[in-house]
Amino acid sequence: MLDLIQTRRALHQIPEIGLEEFKTQAYLLDVIEKLTTGKDFVQIRTWRTGILVYLQGSQPERTIGWRTDIDGLPIVEQTGLPFASQHQGRMHACGHDFHMTIALGCLERALEEQPKNNLLFLFQPAEENEAGGMLMYEDDAFGDWLPDQFYGLHVRPDLKVGQIATNTHTLFAGTCEVKIRFKGKGGHAAFPHEANDALVAASYFVTQVQSVVSRNVNPIEGAVVTFGVFQAGTTNNVITDTAFLHGTIRALTQDMSLLVQKRVKTVAEGVAAAFDMEVEVELKQGGYLPVENNPALARELMDFFDEKDGIELIDIEPAMTGEDFGYLLSKVDGVMFWLGIDSPYALHHPQMSPKEEVLAIGVAAVSSFLKKKAAE
């Protein structure tokens, strides 16, 4: 039987960023091959650093998919754990080591007997940076294994162990990366009339762009425009010719995201025109669409977990965090949910360390749900 804690700790020590998960893939394949030995109803494919494990059903009417992400983050771990990351500057700070371990545990249970319906276990690379789910879909990595229904989870530090949270609508916001570069004319600080100050224009833009949400977005729907990077100038007595801004747009519907993207671009171009300078606007959403749960399937999942002993189901509001599972759920009906891990540190924090007792709880809960879906 798979040792869940040992498996999680082994994976925790080898975090790798998106599309570079070579050790992670090798470890997963080794475990998967041991679990599936002698199971003639199982097929395995790889796609770059991803893995697809397909269980052929005995009388299949549909294919049920379970997705887990496998990449780490470019973070220096500060947990002090004896099994901390062995990869300098890399950490499983978003719980993907937990996701993988739970998926392996569920796979082990699913292999106890051939399911009626087909089951697909997807170990997806590059959730954090390149929208690996979108890349796999666009590259036809699924082929005829593409699920009819897709499910997945994400751990959540502010929920207690034993709590599962989701809803029947949007769970995660769609996210869009924004890069803006204003191009003016540099000069001496003493002669501003001979220059065209990109820093002033960019500063004006930062204040004006706040009106996009306050005056274009329905307050009930909500959206976020945040610029976390502002780079301009090199010294105190030189007027800079360029100013660079790097930020994010987040919205709970794709229509709202597109509206906000359009307005941000319009404001940037308007400010540039007002200051008689050039501007470059780069908007990159890619596969980070809103995670929109299928209402009927979400209600089914919520009712199932609500009746499980040891599980506290929470009907939760959407989060403004992003998840590339939204892309796959734009192609296939499905559901995502939160799994509580009770950590005082947030996701992406260098000291984030979930409680390991959630592993057994997660495997028991998810595998029982997948068993139900596989038998329908």
UniProtKB/Swiss-Prot annotation:
EC assignment: 3.5.1.47
| Pathway(s) it belongs to | Amino-acid biosynthesis; L-lysine biosynthesis via DAP pathway; LL-2,6-diaminopimelate from (S)-tetrahydrodipicolinate (acetylase route): step 3/3
**Entry's InterPro entries?**
AcetylDAP_deacetylase, Amidohydrolase, Bact_exopeptidase_dim_dom, Peptidase_M20, Peptidase_M20_dimer
In terms of domain of life, where is this protein from?
A: Bacteria
Family the entry assigns: Belongs to the peptidase M20A family. N-acetyldiaminopimelate deacetylase subfamily.
**Which top-level enzyme class is recorded in the Swiss-Prot or TrEMBL entry?**
hydrolase
Job description of the protein: Catalyzes the conversion of N-acetyl-diaminopimelate to diaminopimelate and acetate.
**Catalytic residues per the record?**
D69, E128 (proton acceptor)
Q: Which GO terms describe its biological process?
A: diaminopimelate biosynthetic process; lysine biosynthetic process via diaminopimelate
Q: Which PANTHER family match?
A: N-ACETYLDIAMINOPIMELATE DEACETYLASE, PEPTIDASE M20 FAMILY MEMBER
The UniProt keywords, alphabetically, are: Amino-acid biosynthesis, Diaminopimelate biosynthesis, Hydrolase, Lysine biosynthesis
The record, for CDD domains, names: M20_Acy1_YkuR-like (cd05670)
By what name is this protein known? N-acetyldiaminopimelate deacetylase
Q: What is the lineage of its organism?
A: Bacteria, Bacillati, Bacillota, Bacilli, Lactobacillales
Origin species: Streptococcus pneumoniae (strain Hungary19A-6)
Q: Which GO terms describe its molecular function?
A: N-acetyldiaminopimelate deacetylase activity
Kindly state which reaction or reactions the protein catalyses.
N-acetyl-(2S,6S)-2,6-diaminopimelate + H2O = (2S,6S)-2,6-diaminopimelate + acetate
A Pfam family cross-referenced in the UniProt record is: M20_dimer
